[in-house]
Amino acid sequence: MVSRHDPSFMNAMQISIQSLRPNEELWKAHKRQLTDPWVGPGASRHKDMITEATNKLIDNWIDKDEVEFVSEFAMPLPQIVMANIIGFPLEDIPLHKKWGDAMVMPFVYGKGHRNLLTKEQTNEQRALLTEFTDYVVDKVTEKRKNPQEDMISFLTKVTYEPFDRKLTDHEIVGVAYAMIIGGLETTQYAIAHQAQMLVDDPELYVELNNDRNKINAFVEESLRVRAPTQGLSTRMTTQDEFFQGVKVPKGSILHLRYGAANVDPDEFECPHQVNLDRKALTRHLTFSQGHRTCPGNGISRLEQNIAWNCLMDRIDKFEFTQNTQIEYQPGIMLGTLELLLKFRRL
């Protein structure tokens, strides 16, 4: 048993990546065996759970005239879904939120192309991530003794085929870390963006409500136009270059922007418009492409589709209120912090 004070837990996801998926072939195996059955192609197993969670959230505010859409719907939905999938108690969701915020601190408050935190911020993040590690290790211990139908229990039992062995505590913590950092805020922001887009275009809301088969196309187009993660990676130029008429000197730091690629007019006709008939709707880079495509894209897409089907079952129209003020999270994430809406029930 690894000590809960082992500092190597501090970067559990990075350790897990180095151990379980350091190259392309192992990355594919990791997805295929460890995450695909839960949040990838196998995400459909959670359809009933997501539908129930969605309707319960709507129940909480359906009899009101207004809803703060982020805190009362877009945020708690992926929190509930991911807790159920991983096998964490729902009453611990405030803790998961706290630790999830700690995980993304560099992307929100970090400075420079390396997203560096101050010494104080780094110490705060390390303390919070140590709490997360201790929490997951305790859950892993519980699941080994009393396995349930959840992802942590599965990870304690599975034999990882490339290495023909069981996963270590370190590696399970790393997988759980990836599920939290990748499965909460991104889906939250996507659903909130979609609400804004539908309020801005009420005719589109009517069109989707009348033909629910179009909701999936809308989800893909909204993910393309308003990617929750605008970019992550940076590169340094090794020589002077000109890019679209702009001189880029040697040694310049470039930020790779998925959000910009998604609205490239050379790739997408009328790129800023939602086109439900657009060919190759999933061609955008919001979940990346290739063997490193986001492992949780299946569960995120499912949540978004179910969310809007359930909302349209019960809501005839959403509108902004006189007090609606839209502010976005700083950093590389395109995230709406608050979205006050009024609505008309069916």
Predicted regions, residues:
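Cytochrome P450
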Residues: 1-346
